[in-house]
Amino acid sequence: VILLSAAQSRELDRLSQTSYGIDSYRLMTRAGEAVASAVVQRWPEALAAGALVVAGKGNNGGDGFVAARKLREDGAPVSVLLLARTADLKGDAALAYADYVAAGGGIIEAADESSLANQHPGVVIDAIFGTGLNAEIRGSIHGVIEALNRFEVPIVAIDIASGVNADSGAVMGVAVRAALTVTFGYAKYGHVSYPGAGFCGALEVADIGFAAEAIDKISPHGRLIERAEAARLISPRSTNTHKGTYGHVLGVAGSRGKGGAALLVGRGALRAGTGLVTVAIPECVATIVAAGQPELMTEPIADHNGHFASEATIARLTDLIPGMNVVVAGPGIGTSDDTRKVLEWLIREGAAPDRPLLIDADGLNVLAPADPALFKAARGPIVLTPHPGEMARLLSSTTAAVNANRMGAAQRLAEMTDAHVLLKGARSVIVTSASAVRINSSGNPGMATAGMGDVLGGIVGSLMGQGIEPGDALTLGVYVHGHTADRLAARVGSFGYLAGDLAAELPAAFTEIVG
């Protein structure tokens, strides 16, 4: 599913008009009519109490006037509050207002929060701000949006919930909590990336007649990862193969009390189809790991206070790594000084053009804050997979700031490090370059449990080891991880399934995705 930025959306609109002769007011009319149609289809009974359209002075407000006119034509009671003067309306918005008034509609202009006091609609239509909003909402409109959110009726947002940044999903001070958003042509990043996704409600993408050829000129790089996208990345297996065909993954994981992390990395890699998996582990957890999964090969390494001893670890990895297709490092390794030395060495020496290095969990924490020079010195692809807390430490930020603009945080880390970045969480964000952003659609709250990230690291490492390039391995791995969890939740509910359960379910999930 294609995702557009606000600028790309404007360019699609402009090209449709200037290069392909599509009338701008016709586009506005179709947009407003699509909104009215969605309201009638979803809330016909609520419309008996009337629709309240709250409009701004721009084209989003113009769409609102069209929707109001269409609903009146369909027999619904309609009220319109304009958060500006009618003299402020320009262009197509002014034309839409004139057509609405000509059809017998009335408005309250220069409306504010107090104007809502006597309104008792069955449905509210948010036509305040569109996808162009890029500044904090303050003043009277802030109060209007807060008041709208107190209405106990469905709110339908036109194009995007007012207050949500279309490029990042960030909330610009305050945002309308919509039950439904009707957008036009293509979804935008802010519709599907949290926190904005939580304000937009259900998403309906209406075809209003943009020129199909225009999208090719825009060349959008954003994608919402759904099943078809994941299935495209799974190649059929030849009958004439052997275990070496499907790669050799090296996991560098575990410490005293966290041997399970190494096990889960290994299980994720094995269940995602890797031919061979070796886990390098501190000697203190070697027995536990070896007994936990007989298909894993183990490389016990001398430890220091329960963690990898740096000199012994680097010496052993120097011998091991040349025979590997990919390295997954970090889960459960702790944050000692020895660990830091191992991770820095891996970045400088472990990655190669044909051998990606994935760093997760403690491997990220011990490297925080991120040193751009260190990462940019790597000789091969680096993949970083932080959750919001780890991202905050890498960026010298806060978890709250990361969650307020998840896309921005992922893009910033990718730019700093030249790495492929996955920011985990609801609607995980993948950044493979400055312009290529992918957002995952699968997964559920049951995944908020220990070890899920370790399994994911194993899955993505497995896919890279099988020859899938890092960006696509992240795309497929994250989707499969979430889809597998969705299978479990459908069967047992979203409480209490474990990371190990997810690993065991992976083969069936891959088979289902391929169909």
Question: Which residues does each PLM region occupy?
Answer:
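Small-residue (G/A/S/T)-rich helix-start motifs and N-terminal tracts that mark the onset
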Residues: 1-84, 90, 94, 180, ...
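Short amphipathic alpha-helical segment within the helicase RecA-like ATPase core
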Residues: 80, 91, 109, 113, ...
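Short acidic low-complexity segments
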Residues: 107-119, 317
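Structural alpha-helical scaffold elements that stabilize or flank donor/cofactor-binding regions
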Residues: 116-118, 174-175, 319-320, 413
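Internal gly/pro-rich beta-alpha loop/helix module
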Residues: 119-123, 128-220
